[in-house]
From Swiss-Prot:
Part of the 50S ribosomal subunit. GO terms for biological process: regulation of translation; translation. GO terms for molecular function: rRNA binding; structural constituent of ribosome; tRNA binding. It comes from Francisella tularensis subsp. holarctica (strain OSU18). The keyword Oxidoreductase does not apply. Belongs to the universal ribosomal protein uL1 family. Binds directly to 23S rRNA. The L1 stalk is quite mobile in the ribosome, and is involved in E site tRNA release. Protein L1 is also a translational repressor protein, it controls the translation of the L11 operon by binding to its mRNA. Keywords: Repressor, Ribonucleoprotein, Ribosomal protein, RNA-binding, rRNA-binding, Translation regulation, tRNA-binding. This is Large ribosomal subunit protein uL1. The keyword Repressor applies. Pfam families: Ribosomal_L1 (PF00687).
């Protein structure tokens, strides 16, 4: 098994120059070339930002609605009542409730990928922080998951919204689709993400903000991207 792995790694290393910045379409073509798994891998992106995440006013977080989606089916739970609950159901939310939904969460019944909450439901949701927080599911106004317009938030989540938060090294990690997307679709998704990241630039951030962009498939190596010709 090790021999197989090392042989594959050698083949990949021969195809990818770690020092080179590849044009976007070429980078996506390379991802497909070096993919050797049986499932359809996600295309992940890492963006190194010129921020100091140790400082609270330089923590970059937010959400981006990718024009071509992520290729994933997203199940949405919404904490809301009255007309807001009705609107959430109409928008396609799988689960809608208040205390009853909180009880299900406490029991560990969490068959959903995104949690959205209306502001008046936060008294209920607030009790679930220790359960939802570690799973990255806690609603937050900064990424649009605590909102008066729960129906729009549901539609955005279903349409392929990705959420991001800068890590301790100043890097954003998220997904922009699947390897079976066309290169154009992946490029458009990447452009949207980088555009939204630029809008989220902290006022105190100095120097180069978008420092480095690399893409990879789920099981593949990172490929540096030349993003200078992107429409951002």
């Amino acid at each position: 098994m090790m021999a197989k792995v090392s042989k594959r790694m050698k083949e990949i290393s021969a195809k990818i120059n770690a020092e080179k910045k590849y044009p976007v379409s070429e980078a996506f073509d390379l991802l497909r070339e070096v993919s050797s798994v049986k499932f359809v891998e996600s295309v992940d992106v890492s963006v190194a930002l010129g921020v100091d995440p140790r400082k609270s006013d330089q923590v970059v977080r937010g959400a981006s609605v990718l024009p071509n989606g992520t290729g994933k089916t997203v199940r949405v739970a919404v904490f809301a009542k009255g007309p807001a609950a009705d609107a959430a159901k109409e928008a396609g939310a799988e689960v809608v409730g208040m205390e009853d939904l909180a009880d299900e969460v406490k029991k560990g019944n969490m068959d959903f990928d995104v949690v959205i909450a209306s502001p008046d439901s936060m008294r209920v949701v607030g009790q679930l922080g220790q359960i939802l927080g570690p799973k990255g599911l806690m609603p937050n106004p900064k990424v649009g998951t605590v909102t008066m317009d729960v129906a729009k938030a549901v539609r955005d989540a279903k349409a392929g919204q990705v959420r991001y938060r800068v890590d301790k090294a100043g890097i954003i990690h998220t997904t922009i689709g699947k390897v079976n997307f066309t290169s154009d679709a992946l490029k458009q998704n990447l452009e949207q993400l980088l555009t939204d990241l630029k809008k989220a630039k902290p006022a105190v951030s100095k120097g180069i903000y978008l420092k480095k962009v690399s893409v990879s498939s789920t099981m593949g190596p990172g490929i540096n991207v030349d993003f200078s010709d992107l429409n951002i």
